[in-house]
């Protein structure tokens, strides 16, 4: 991993699906540059494992168990992350699920709704919370973390 690419000390990033794969890789990259990181995932054990990895980089890290397809859960988890970190400067809506059916034409409506709930609606719910937070910060004179 590249070191000293740029300094993100004092910045906070929120990453959904941050407990594995691309999301954890993004979290590691940001933390390695001094960024505080809040990760969200649906599996508490995977969240704990990811936190153990992220803590080695030094900045404050946190995790929330969150189903991004639930707008109330997203709002609650965003508030919890803000309570821990005080702000969010960057938001990465990385959480995603695939279909469980072996073929598209065998997919049930419930399965389709689950996929759309996470992969589409979840992105909207997360970015809506982030945008509201960032807009509020900008209106109070803290535009773009400056």
Where are these regions (language model features)?
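A short, exposed helix-loop element centered on a Lys and neighboring polar residues
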Residues: 127-128
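Conserved NAD(P)H cofactor-binding loop of Rossmann-fold oxidoreductase domains
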Residues: 94-100
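The beta1-alpha1 cofactor-binding region of Rossmann-like NAD(H)/NADP(H)-dependent oxidoreductases
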Residues: 44, 65-77, 109
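Active-site loop of short-chain dehydrogenase/reductase
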Residues: 11, 60, 87-88, 134-146
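Conserved glycine-rich Rossmann-like NAD(P)H-binding loop of the short-chain dehydrogenase/reductase
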Residues: 33-49
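Substrate-binding pocket helix/loop in short-chain dehydrogenase/reductase
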Residues: 102-104, 111-116
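Conserved glycine-rich cofactor-binding loop
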Residues: 12, 19-21, 43
């Amino acid at each position: 991993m590249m070191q000293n690419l740029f300094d993100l000390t004092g910045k906070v990033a929120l990453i959904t699906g941050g407990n594995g794969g691309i999301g954890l890789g993004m979290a590691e990259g940001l933390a390695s540059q001094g960024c505080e990181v809040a990760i969200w995932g649906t599996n508490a054990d995977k969240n704990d494992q990811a936190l153990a990895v992220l803590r080695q980089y030094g900045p404050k890290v946190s995790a929330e168990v969150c189903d991004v397809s639930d707008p109330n859960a997203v709002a609650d988890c965003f508030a919890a992350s803000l309570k821990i970190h005080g702000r969010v400067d960057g938001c990465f809506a990385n959480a995603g699920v695939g279909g469980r059916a072996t073929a598209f034409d065998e997919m049930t409506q419930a399965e389709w709704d689950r996929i759309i709930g996470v992969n589409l609606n979840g992105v909207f719910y997360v970015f809506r919370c982030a945008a509201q937070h960032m807009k509020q910060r900008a209106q109070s004179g803290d535009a773009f973390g400056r």
